[in-house]
Amino acid sequence: MGLSDGEWQLVLHVWGKVEADLAGHGQEVLIRLFKGHPETLEKFNKFKHIKSEDEMKASEDLKKHGVTVLTALGGVLKKKGHHEAEIKPLAQSHATKHKIPIKYLEFISEAIIHVLQSKHPGBFGADABGAMNKALELFRKDIAAKYKELGFQG
């Protein structure tokens, strides 16, 4: 399940592109998530009333949350699999406070991959795509293990 040094290099290279515009990427990821899986919107009190893509694009709260999500994920990715300290509080809040099922983390992972493919085709070829998918799968697996420790059946 672990990634090679070369795979981590690919992940972190494209992640540098994400960090250059966290707000734009985060907004696109959340819009893609909510459009593809409208049921996920119910978990977000701040924007569950938003229905149209135009409203989503205009929402400062949505943009801010996109930055929060991608900043946290970037912190995890930069640890190259040694992310216990980063994962623990994320799992705690997502299991006990927000009650986010692992399935929703799969959905947002798909949205992230799609946004990277569309925004960075030159930097996100098959190898980078495969590496990022592995990194996101590792993240989800480790969150799921923490969920289990916490007794959350998400």
From Swiss-Prot:
It holds the Pfam family Globin. It is found in: Cytoplasm, Sarcoplasm. GO terms for molecular function: heme binding; metal ion binding; nitrite reductase activity; oxygen binding; oxygen carrier activity; peroxidase activity. Its main location: cytoplasm. The modification Phosphoserine is found at S4. Its EC number is 1.7.-.-, 1.11.1.-. Residues 2-148 form the Globin domain. It catalyses: Fe(III)-heme b-[protein] + nitric oxide + H2O = Fe(II)-heme b-[protein] + nitrite + 2 H(+); H2O2 + AH2 = A + 2 H2O. The modification Phosphothreonine is found at T68. O2 binds at H65. Nitrite binds at H65. It is an enzyme of class 1 (oxidoreductase). Heme b binds at H94. GO terms for biological process: removal of superoxide radicals. Keywords: Cytoplasm, Heme, Iron, Metal-binding, Muscle protein, Oxidoreductase, Oxygen transport, Phosphoprotein, Transport. One of its GO terms (cellular component) is extracellular exosome. PROSITE patterns: GLOBIN. InterPro entries: Globin, Globin-like_sf, Myoglobin. It comes from the Eukaryota. Monomeric. Monomeric heme protein which primary function is to store oxygen and facilitate its diffusion within muscle tissues. Reversibly binds oxygen through a pentacoordinated heme iron and enables its timely and efficient release as needed during periods of heightened demand. Depending on the oxidative conditions of tissues and cells, and in addition to its ability to bind oxygen, it also has a nitrite reductase activity whereby it regulates the production of bioactive nitric oxide. Belongs to the globin family. This is Myoglobin. The lineage of its organism: Eukaryota, Metazoa, Chordata, Craniata, Vertebrata. The gene is MB.
